[in-house]
């Protein structure tokens, strides 16, 4: 027997939007106000469902908030559903279709009405192959037990889900294995579940899964950006103005290097460096799928960049700075010989001009297509930073974004005078899978997240994106780097 947990703390319209629900999916007529943007905490929300009565004379009842999924015969055989309603009441519902058992934990106010409704329905003549009508159509309908049961439960499912359950659905399995089924498909139907997700939890650990049907995401990706955390959709045109922060949960989504430069640098002050420097194929890397040079060309066309980092000088609230921004969209922000050379030249320029230095890190590590040439960039950049920091006593701030891993973490990512990380950033040297395969040990969930590493003292600050520019400005002035124009400090 498996146990299924439904968390109904979130509001109706999100689930309706995600699953495409605007009316009852299965049987007892439309649901009131499902297309309106209501306050989820309104008292009359409990009225928005039909009872188990007839279609023509429907009434409303608290009993009508049940549980369920589509294709009930395929999904439920011997299950216990754990439900929390929006008042915080929790209760369990046990259902065994084969043995005709339907139980609710004792003492809950839903029990009497819900059980009596269930057994009244179960004992109807057409479920027991009882009396037939003279109408051939009705006879066919009455004899179809699966269709009748499915339809009736589905109507309850629709009512409960639209009024109570959002996308944050937890499945607690009684077995040791994770459930591989997507509840969103059962809840929303095959055609309605695109973009929905579940969070599957067993023995204290949690994994988040999204629908594997990517057609709808691909079709509308020029309009919407899906949050990696809550799977909410964000309108692409306004996402940039919101600093790529998810409107639903505030999660820090990935940003391109150009957007980060625009966010950090004052208008009309950016002067790019070494834009014409491009990668070759120094070790003639062999690939059966795509030659290295062709892959570079492909990413250049896709991103509009020549390499995985942009470097240059500009002003931050009037303070002249040297800035390097890595772009994860270009080959995962991997560090090859060109990336290393551009960053080294930027550091040397900042050293000569006595400028504060910022490098925004977003990288999967050294670029394997360039072999040891990519690895030596770690030493080259670190050597340039040593002269910048130790000899010239200048100020360097790395900003670690998600993800920052591999050779970048092992070199200039962790050499700052003040190290700043973005919230929820994934920061590591080796990835979780590599560690587990190498050491044959399980890596705890969240142990490579910025918040956990901050508690261990790995860096100095976690700064939200909307506060980053002002925090950097304060740090620079604290270290005696002041605006060229004193009026700009007010901005």
From Swiss-Prot:
Pfam families assigned to the protein according to its UniProt record, in alphabetical order: Carboxyl_trans (PF01039)
GO biological process: fatty acid biosynthetic process; malonyl-CoA biosynthetic process
Cofactor binding, note field: Binds 1 zinc ion per subunit.
GO CC term, one of those recorded: chloroplast stroma
Domain annotation CoA carboxyltransferase N-terminal: ranges: 223-491
Substrates-to-products reaction catalysed: N(6)-carboxybiotinyl-L-lysyl-[protein] + acetyl-CoA = N(6)-biotinyl-L-lysyl-[protein] + malonyl-CoA
UniProt subcellular location: Plastid, Chloroplast stroma
Molecular functions (GO terms): acetyl-CoA carboxylase activity; ATP binding; carboxyl- or carbamoyltransferase activity; zinc ion binding
Residues where Zn(2+) binds: 227, 230, 246, 249
Disordered as annotated region, ranges: 28-56
Subunit structure: Acetyl-CoA carboxylase is a heterohexamer composed of biotin carboxyl carrier protein, biotin carboxylase and 2 subunits each of ACCase subunit alpha and ACCase plastid-coded subunit beta (accD).
Function: Component of the acetyl coenzyme A carboxylase (ACC) complex. Biotin carboxylase (BC) catalyzes the carboxylation of biotin on its carrier protein (BCCP) and then the CO(2) group is transferred by the transcarboxylase to acetyl-CoA to form malonyl-CoA.
Protein name as annotated: Acetyl-coenzyme A carboxylase carboxyl transferase subunit beta, chloroplastic
Gene (UniProt): accD
